[in-house]
Amino acid sequence: MVFSKISQVAHYTPKQVISNDDLSQIMDTSHEWISSRTGIEKRHISTVEMTSDLAIRVAEQLLAGSGYDATALDFIIVATISPDASMPSTAAKVQAAIGATNAFAFDMTAACSGFVFALAMADKLIASGAYQRGLVIGAETLSKIIDWQDRSTAVLFGDGAGGVLLEASEQQHFLAEALHTDGARSQSLTSGQSSLRSPFSQGQEVNSFLQMDGRAIFDFAIRDVSRSIAAIIEQSGLAKEELDYLLLHQANRRILDKMAKKIGMPREKFLENMMHYGNTSAASIPILLSESVQNGQLKLDGSQHILLSGFGGGLTWGSLIVKI
């Protein structure tokens, strides 16, 4: 059988950093108010770089680290809710920029679960035996879809990108998977809504900015996502103690605190970096993954077990247990 493994990780964020104090200059908020409720202290906000620019920088790093030429790639998947345009896809722009002429490329829209969903799909592509390697990238410029007059959302989000190189392996590294969607609760978190505009249609005004029912999302994460994580750990056959770290979507420190108690695992096993980046949606998990390899917490030598879990708009939520 053919399996897949994560062989390279990388991340990139815009240079401009906006602190909570900076936000307090343009809206009614404060560092204490934001940090005490979310754990967020600052975020990176793009000045000129688009989502594809961030993703391209990640792709270039992944190739440089691997030693592969871009023509060796079979596919590129970019998870994003803030693409440069509806078409061409962000992934197509990455493919062109790095010269991956043999790769097919497409975007995946699953909000903050996007990277986990995309990684699960990429694992199946390689396991089919038809493809040898590809890039999976989460990239966002959420700053362009936020209403900067709405402090309930504007203080939460940031821009950035992260990704992995996935390639064929003789050993199994993806040990368990659980992906979920509940479209009946879709109105709890929305963005990019559009109206019919033809001369033959009856359009209506819509709010295209990101809108979120914070309490509903908080409750959803604590209830549904925690239950799913507990179930996938049991499904994997691993004892909780055998999981080295859990890398969850970086939405809110309070969510991680409550999840640790709900699942019954030590809080120190839940890695976090939302204090530096805010919520970067599909980019949050791969940025955290890359940073954790960079700082030595994760070895990338096949000796550790980690759980990746994303949750957000859709509603969507999904988890993977990976030997890394």
Curated annotation (Swiss-Prot):
Pfam family, one: ACP_syn_III_C
Record-linked CDD domains: KAS_III
A GO cellular component entry from the record: cytoplasm
Domain of life of the source: Bacteria
This protein's UniProt keywords: Acyltransferase, Cytoplasm, Fatty acid biosynthesis, Fatty acid metabolism, Lipid biosynthesis, Lipid metabolism, Multifunctional enzyme, Transferase
EC nos: 2.3.1.180
A GO biological process held by the record: fatty acid biosynthetic process
Family designation: Belongs to the thiolase-like superfamily. FabH family.
Function according to Swiss-Prot or TrEMBL: Catalyzes the condensation reaction of fatty acid synthesis by the addition to an acyl acceptor of two carbons from malonyl-ACP. Catalyzes the first condensation reaction which initiates fatty acid synthesis and may therefore play a role in governing the total rate of fatty acid production. Possesses both acetoacetyl-ACP synthase and acetyl transacylase activities. Its substrate specificity determines the biosynthesis of branched-chain and/or straight-chain of fatty acids.
HAMAP family to which the protein is assigned, alphabetical: FabH (MF_01815)
Domain notes: The last Arg residue of the ACP-binding site is essential for the weak association between ACP/AcpP and FabH.
Name listed for the protein in its UniProt record: Beta-ketoacyl-[acyl-carrier-protein] synthase III
Species the sequence originates in: Streptococcus equi subsp. zooepidemicus (strain MGCS10565)
